């Protein structure tokens, strides 16, 4: 039931949805409220002389450095890593999972990331290995200084979040750091530690940018990917955390004005929030929040055309409306604000091969007592 209470969201995206999250209106600010100074295990320890302390058994340092340098010089170690994995049975456990620390190159690049001269290359190489090793996220989180190094990469670019100041190289470097954060955010053993450390708050200055330059689009898209990894597995703890931030208004603004790919990830995050009972209750708690969401969804529908295939956007839009209709008061209002293009046959041909979306749209119209043809 909607109430007349004032919204408790901030207006980070230009929508009146209340406050409670960190201030994201000044991307150049180096201070992120609510973020603890210690972001992971061992952050306040002294750096050991022999290299970073890693989770589990570490390979021989000499072999690690030698192999890492050789592969770095070759510039293409993907095939070599795969061959090494196949030829070394010790790298595979009884269940067939490959351990990251059994690969000496992982150790080498983590050493480089924490205090070596090849940090930029380390970000790239470790990002390439995230699909190869299931436990890379645990290694990244548990290894001395790694999370601090990743956060330093992110914080260092805050003063550059202005047009003409953010270079392609710097944007790519930060995106590579964000890819590793996404790896940590998506792993079941590190996801909640990632949240407890409030690390997602460090991404909000990137989400709060509005420039359409490619460098900024990449930052927004990769930052959205980290949030998307958090919400992917329907954890109420994640949703509850995000609802205390400005993520909803930021996603709404991106859905209004960013690239189609960024819009798709942003609406995916919104859909995941709505699918959670806490998220649905939150959005439907006030008229301001409800209309902030439905107005953006309506504008997105109006900009979709049959000549330009809407891709996954239409699919997510329909599912957001369908979930909103589960709230009785929202259902009554949806009968008034649902776009005409979803009531008629505008997207019939577009949805012809999408059985799931057709079914969701039919269910939505039936729920709203609409006639379907």
Curated annotation (Swiss-Prot):
A Gene Ontology cellular-component term: P-body
Keywords: Activator, Cytoplasm, Nucleus, Repressor, Transcription, Transcription regulation
Bias type Gly residues, positions: 11-22
Biased composition (Low complexity): 50-88
Compartments, as annotated in UniProt: Cytoplasm; Nucleus
The UniProt record lists the keyword RNA-binding: no
SUPFAM superfamilies recorded: ARM repeat
Record Pfam families: Rcd1
Domain of life per record: Eukaryota
Residue ranges of the region described as Disordered: 1-91
Example of a GO biological process term: positive regulation of transcription elongation by RNA polymerase II
Assembly and binders: Subunit of the 1.0 MDa CCR4-NOT core complex that contains CCR4, CAF1, NOT1, NOT2, NOT3, NOT4, NOT5, CAF40 and CAF130. In the complex interacts with NOT1. The core complex probably is part of a less characterized 1.9 MDa CCR4-NOT complex.
UniProt record similarity statement: Belongs to the CNOT9 family.
Additional facts recorded: Present with 18800 molecules/cell in log phase SD medium.
Function: Acts as a component of the CCR4-NOT core complex, which in the nucleus seems to be a general transcription factor, and in the cytoplasm the major mRNA deadenylase involved in mRNA turnover.
Protein name per its UniProtKB record: Protein CAF40
Organism name: Saccharomyces cerevisiae (strain ATCC 204508 / S288c) (Baker's yeast)
The organism's taxonomic lineage, starting at the top: Eukaryota, Fungi, Dikarya, Ascomycota, Saccharomycotina
